[in-house]
Amino acid sequence: MSLLPYAWAKAQRALLRPGEHGATLLVSPRTPGWAISEVRQRHAPASLESVRDDELDTLLASAYSDTGSAAAVVGAAESEVDLDRLMDDIPEVTDLLDTQDGAPVIRMINALLTQAARDEASDIHIEPFETHSVVRYRVDGALRDVVAPRKALHAALVSRIKIMAQLDIAEKRLPQDGRIALRVAGRPIDIRVSTVPTGHGERVVMRLLDKQAGRLRLETLGMAPGVLAPLDNLIRQPHGIVLVTGPTGSGKTTTLYAALARLDASTSNILTVEDPVEYDLPGISQIQVNARIDMTFAVALRAILRQDPDIIMIGEIRDLETAQIAVQASLTGHLVLATLHTNDAVSAVTRLVDMGVEPFLLASSMLGVLAQRLVRRLCTHCRVEEDGGWRAVGCPACNQTGYSGRTGIHELFVIDDEIRRLVHQGRAEQDLREAARAAGMRSMREDGERWIASGSTTLEEILRVTRDA
């Protein structure tokens, strides 16, 4: 935290950092002399330190990203709501810390977004009830309460968010979807906004997409060597289908992005069809579906097949038409990467057959299926060892949850010649699973044993995320 307003500190290239023995004034070669004199006169810093200009940017972002405590803003906002300020126009992309607007509702929303980014929340829920509202963050896959504003503040919060997302603030009877692009402490954040009417007002969910998070590599996703090496071999095949399966929020898209980043976009024509485009991938053409204008997955896929693609990524195979186009594309010399909603890897074959894809086509086109879940990591500050394992406790570092961060557990179903023969014959799912196990496939629960042994998570956490697997 600093004692100087962020906009002034950024413009004048000065950071006043409190310390045990007095404040330190950090400056760069671009800091004007009059600004140094003014800070010295007003705050009497104990010392002066010069840093590189780019280093000062990093220090500014770090210091001021901790000033947006949502709970600290709620009290002031509840007592002074200025609805007229909600209609103020805002720039298309802005850094929240640059905002000098004093309207309490705007300050509160800025604080909520800043704190969510700092806590690495994936979603913000704003839920209305009879006497109050509740704001919750989803962190590491679990929801937790953040603040509970009075009910009188709810409509103002929703209206401001709808303005930021360019939604119709007068329409309160129908669901609406929008998008906000902004920066928080220098980090580009894309926010998908969804509103739905309820009996006590509009409910809002904001999905936060940190664009820098899309630069992950497969090696950082927690895959065992016995999964990473064969998966790397699958995605380097010239044609065929590789699927990633799991429930919503299990990291499927992140895995596909990491796989695409592993491939050479300079020598291959890589195109994606997504709903929505979550992260920008350099060197890759990304297409977003739009149901309002009938730009469906199937329509987009037919179009990109005329774009001379080498590799195609499909955000999700949702229907027979999309599945058939994906299969035909793989049979005509294209590598297709896609996601599918199934509980485990083997059931992906059953799901596609149930959709209406012929087994002989799947046998000819499929290369493999990766199923995955995300498990919470134990907080290293407070975990305790007992009975040969580890237990979550809770401390300030992990917001009393006992967990901090997540990692993946996986099972990789490689379609070898024997399994290909079984698929062609239309054999039962259990026969495919037995053949895969005989070939060395490990289940997600078995994969999770290594994280339990290393003290990274607990047996309860592995069982929680694999109940349906």
UniProtKB/Swiss-Prot annotation:
Disulfide bonds: none
Expression induction: Induced by phosphate limitation.
Annotated ATP binding sites: G246, P247, T248, G249, S250, G251, K252, T253
Primary subcellular site in the record, as a coarse category: cytoplasm
GO MF annotation, one: ATP hydrolysis activity
Pfam families referenced in this protein's UniProt entry, alphabetically: GSPE_N1E, T2SSE
EC nos: 7.4.2.8
Gene3D superfamilies attached to this UniProt entry: 3.30.450.90, P-loop containing nucleotide triphosphate hydrolases, Type II secretion system, protein E, N-terminal domain
Entry function: ATPase component of the type II secretion system required for the energy-dependent secretion of extracellular factors from the periplasm. Acts as a molecular motor to provide the energy that is required for the export of proteins. The Hxc system is involved in the secretion of low-molecular-weight alkaline phosphatase L-AP (LapA). Is probably also involved in the secretion of the phosphate-binding protein PstS.
Protein family (similarity comment): Belongs to the GSP E family.
Entry-linked CDD domains: PulE-GspE-like
Gene label: hxcR
Localization per Swiss-Prot or TrEMBL: Cytoplasm
GO annotations of cellular component type: cytoplasm; plasma membrane; type II protein secretion system complex
Reaction catalyzed: ATP + H2O + cellular proteinSide 1 = ADP + phosphate + cellular proteinSide 2
GO biological process: one example: protein secretion by the type II secretion system
InterPro entries given in the database record: AAA+_ATPase, GSPE_N1E, P-loop_NTPase, T2SS/T4SS_dom, T2SS_E_N_sf, T2SS_GspE
Keyword Translocase set for record: yes
Observed phenotype of the null mutant: Mutant cannot secrete the low-molecular-weight alkaline phosphatase LapA. Deletion mutant shows decreased ability to express outer surface PstS, but not intracellular PstS.
Record's protein name: Type II secretion system protein HxcR
Species for this entry: Pseudomonas aeruginosa (strain ATCC 15692 / DSM 22644 / CIP 104116 / JCM 14847 / LMG 12228 / 1C / PRS 101 / PAO1)
Keyword entries, A-Z: ATP-binding, Cytoplasm, Nucleotide-binding, Protein transport, Translocase, Transport
EC category name: translocase
